[in-house]
From Swiss-Prot:
Superkingdom of the source species: Bacteria
Any one GO MF annotation of this record: rRNA binding
Keyword Transferase: no
UniProt source species: Mycobacteroides abscessus (strain ATCC 19977 / DSM 44196 / CCUG 20993 / CIP 104536 / JCM 13569 / NCTC 13031 / TMC 1543 / L948)
Record protein name field: Small ribosomal subunit protein uS11
Bias-annotated ranges (Low complexity): 1-12
Region (Disordered): 1-27, 119-138
Keyword list, A-Z: Ribonucleoprotein, Ribosomal protein, RNA-binding, rRNA-binding
Pfam family membership, one: Ribosomal_S11
Biased composition (Basic residues): 13-22
Any single Gene Ontology cellular-component annotation: ribonucleoprotein complex
Protein role: Located on the platform of the 30S subunit, it bridges several disparate RNA helices of the 16S rRNA. Forms part of the Shine-Dalgarno cleft in the 70S ribosome.
GO biological process, one term: translation
Subunit structure: Part of the 30S ribosomal subunit. Interacts with proteins S7 and S18. Binds to IF-3.
Length: 138
């Protein structure tokens, strides 16, 4: 019989999970990435560390309903609520992408109680880069 290896089939230790400490960040940045299929809202501190995030899929929408403005509204409200728990009161908004949830997400950040400062569009523009997808024929 082979000697037993230490810790081979012994009792498992409980995993130590570290609770994220609540930061107190009064001013942050809201990054809204709106694609044709989804909308992702991330709220960060001034250094760029993510405080809270939400997306249309994370809120509970699936398939083509993720790309609706209503799904973007709920995602932005969810992210704003979580950010307010960390003390965020004012945000600058950076919008990226061509999706339908851009304006709705900005409005719902304001409606959730965050003061919106500057709004800037940071959608990347190709200098004749990749070939775009072919036209749809319906």
């Amino acid at each position: 019989m082979a000697p037993k290896k230490p810790g081979a089939a012994g009792p498992k230790k409980a995993q130590k999970t570290r609770r994220r400490e609540k930061k107190n960040v009064p001013h942050g940045a809201a990054h809204i990435k709106s694609t044709f299929n989804n909308t992702i809202v991330s709220i960060t501190d001034p250094q760029g560390n993510v405080i809270s995030w939400a997306s249309s899929g994370h809120v509970g929408f699936k398939g083509s309903r993720k790309s609706t403005p209503f799904a973007a509204q709920l995602a932005a409200e969810n992210a704003a609520r979580k950010a307010q728990e960390h003390g965020v009161k004012k945000v600058d908004v950076f919008v990226k992408g061509p999706g339908s949830g851009r304006e709705t997400a900005i409005r719902s950040l304001q409606a959730a109680g965050l003061e919106v400062g500057a709004i800037s569009d940071v959608t990347p523009q190709p200098h004749n880069g990749c070939r775009p997808p072919k036209r749809r024929r319906v």
